[in-house]
């Protein structure tokens, strides 16, 4: 990695220095320094052979060489950054406020990885410039919730935002976020429970960060609970949409109604897989991603495990047709037609297929490591319970222990 990273403050790296020996030219390592600088979102790249320096300024696009004793001080680099940013127009007061605000640190809070720092800095920077719709794409397992927390922390502490709504579609996502990554903000955090909160509206004002399930805000029969809880549509100035590809970007989604109600707020969409279809588009709503850290990036950097795809064909798969009189798991005769993989465990449940899949998984684990951590994705909870039982039966020898 880079030989030296120079920081303007704990949140902002400002320069990369690549060191070579005197047998190389002063600019020999400049391209390497520029590569690292682009990776870390750093604006000044330097190379040195011990006798002088070569500089590439990403803000102006210009390069120069200078003597070893002329290297700019931290204060000089910061002033250049402040004045040269935004195509020479300089940084705004809001940009300075978030740049100077450090990340949340503490005994149980690990420092951000380089790509998390990039994601946070890009996001808060875009918001400081006035961008109201922001898309952040990060591969699963790279710390999206931690990144969201650091974004919220810096925006709140810098004063740019005061009231935050964090939207998700599953309880476990909300509860884990509150209990883990957002724990440093627990005194100002509240999980919305419509049945309780509707009777204590005056107490909501004491919180800054609200977590909510879409279902709690929408209510039964599209009751629009969010209007009762928050009659002022300008109540929130920041809305974060977790896994925004699941529905918030769909034009006719009830979830979109929530976003439209709080339309004056800045909206941040976070996803590992931005959805782009005729009917649903993350990019058309949130805009092009301000930062992307892909699965490929994570594997290359060593933060994610590499994988290989093993395709297995089951006897009951695509273009399967039942035999005459064949019955499903409920004992009902299966309709005589062609079935595809998208039908199974949704439109039709066939126990033989579940057993076959469980056996294939078992065979693979027997050939590798039966004690290896394994995740099996299922259609729903009912399917998951059937698969659990099938796996237990296929591994009865292990279950006896």
What are these regions (language model features)?
Residues 1-163, 168, 172-188, 205-209, ...:
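ATP-dependent helicase/translocase motor core
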Residues 111-119, 144-147, 346-358, 383:
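Phosphate/oxyanion-binding active-site loops and adjacent basic polyanion-contact surfaces
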Residues 172-196, 390-399:
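Conserved helix-turn-beta segment of the N-terminal RecA-like "Helicase ATP-binding" lobe
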Residues 173, 216, 245-246, 275-276:
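Residues immediately C-terminal
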Residues 196-210:
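Conserved motor-coupling elements within RecA-like helicase/translocase cores
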Residues 229-268:
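SF2 helicase catalytic motif II
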Residues 280-372, 388:
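Interdomain helical connector at the RecA1-RecA2 junction of SF1/SF2 helicase-like NTPases
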Residues 371-401:
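Carboxylate/His-rich catalytic cores and anion/metal-binding grooves
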């Amino acid at each position: 990695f880079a030989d030296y990273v120079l920081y303007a403050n704990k949140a902002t790296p400002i320069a990369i220095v690549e060191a070579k020996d005197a047998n190389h030219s002063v600019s020999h390592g400049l391209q390497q320094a520029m590569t690292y600088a682009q990776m870390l979102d750093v604006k000044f790249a330097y190379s040195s052979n011990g006798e002088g320096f070569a500089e590439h300024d990403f803000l102006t696009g210009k390069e120069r060489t200078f003597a070893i004793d002329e290297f700019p001080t931290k204060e000089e680099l910061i002033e250049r950054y402040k004045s040269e940013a935004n195509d020479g127009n300089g940084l705004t007061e809001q940009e300075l406020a978030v740049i100077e605000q450090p990340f949340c640190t503490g005994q149980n809070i690990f420092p951000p990885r380089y790509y998390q720092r990039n994601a946070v800095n890009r996001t808060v920077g875009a918001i400081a410039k006035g961008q109201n719709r922001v898309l952040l794409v990060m591969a699963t397992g790279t710390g999206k919730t931690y990144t969201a927390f650091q974004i919220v922390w810096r925006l709140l502490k810098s004063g740019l935002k005061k009231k935050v709504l964090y939207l998700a579609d599953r309880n476990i996502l909300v509860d884990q976020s509150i209990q883990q990554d957002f724990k440093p903000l627990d005194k100002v955090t509240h999980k919305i429970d419509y049945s309780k909160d509707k009777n204590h509206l005056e107490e909501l004002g004491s919180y800054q960060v609200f977590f909510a399930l879409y279902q709690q805000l929408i209510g039964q029969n599209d009751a629009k609970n969010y209007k009762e809880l928050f009659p002022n549509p300008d109540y929130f100035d920041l809305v974060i949409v977790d896994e925004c590809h699941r529905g918030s970007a769909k034009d006719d989604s009830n979830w979109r109604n929530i976003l439209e109600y709080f339309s004056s707020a800045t909206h941040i969409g976070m996803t590992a897989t931005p959805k782009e279809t005729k009917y649903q588009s993350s990019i058309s709503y949130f805009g092009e991603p301000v930062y992307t850290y892909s699965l490929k990036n994570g594997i290359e950097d060593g933060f994610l495990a590499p994988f290989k795809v093993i395709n297995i064909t089951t006897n009951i798969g695509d273009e399967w047709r039942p035999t005459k009189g064949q019955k499903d798991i409920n004992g009902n005769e299966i309709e005589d037609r062609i079935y595809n993989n998208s039908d199974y465990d949704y439109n039709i449940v066939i126990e033989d297929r579940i057993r076959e899949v469980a056996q294939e998984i078992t065979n693979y684990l027997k050939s590798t490591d039966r004690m290896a951590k394994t995740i099996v994705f299922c259609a729903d909870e009912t399917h998951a319970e059937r698969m659990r039982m099938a796996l237990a039966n296929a591994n009865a020898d292990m279950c006896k222990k």
